[in-house]
Amino acid sequence: MEKFCTICGKELVDGKCPCCEKGTDKKSDSTNNEKKFSNNGVINRVAIKNEAKRLIENNLWTIWKPSLIVSLISGILGTLITALFGEGTDASTIISAIANVFLLPMSIGLVQYVLNFVRGKSYDINDLFSFYDKRFLLIFLTSFLVGLFTTLWSLLLIIPGIIAALSYSMITYLLADGKKDDAMEVIKESKRMMNGYKMDYFVFGLSFIGWALLCTLIIPIIYVMPYMTVSNALYYEELRKIKG
């Protein structure tokens, strides 16, 4: 039995670390709860991206591991569906849609994992499966409504569709935080948070285009995916502090 914490090195008391509280559970070295990346409501996008670079240094596998697990499960399901029902058939299309619904809570679990990482809290692969409970219905209804609303706005023109997508961009993080129990309330909260920040977040996303193009070379994606994932989580964190 270990006598010292594998995170900070302090002596364990009754098997738990008095400093880390979670004993030997993994924790990130983030101190973002104390950091501020905005001034008078203006978000410093460069500072957020620099912080993301700092956090993923020596932690690329930390972010990749849960992402690969989700991708692996998704890939296995896709392969099985194709093998059993054929490719492009009505049956395979229906079963694939059902499989995607099944994977929704796991995608929110992945977001929770990343949020725990950037917040300096304990994070674990089990986070991926923490939403397969009564919140399953909330996640499904919210995702369905977001898809419906975005599609309806897109039918008008491309621009309204983009604006709608930006308005809903914080929904996955809000679902991971679990502070709302109603699908429409989650959607309204995302719209409230993004009010006045849609263009800023759009520009923030555009700033990664160069990195995204590098991913066509395959190897850079090893760095780019964690970088973008953590950067977006940090943006949500800062926006949450601003909006309250």
Language model segments and positions:
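Selective recognition of hydrophobic, aromatic-rich stretches within alpha-helical transmembrane segments
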Residues: 40, 89-123, 150-185, 215-244
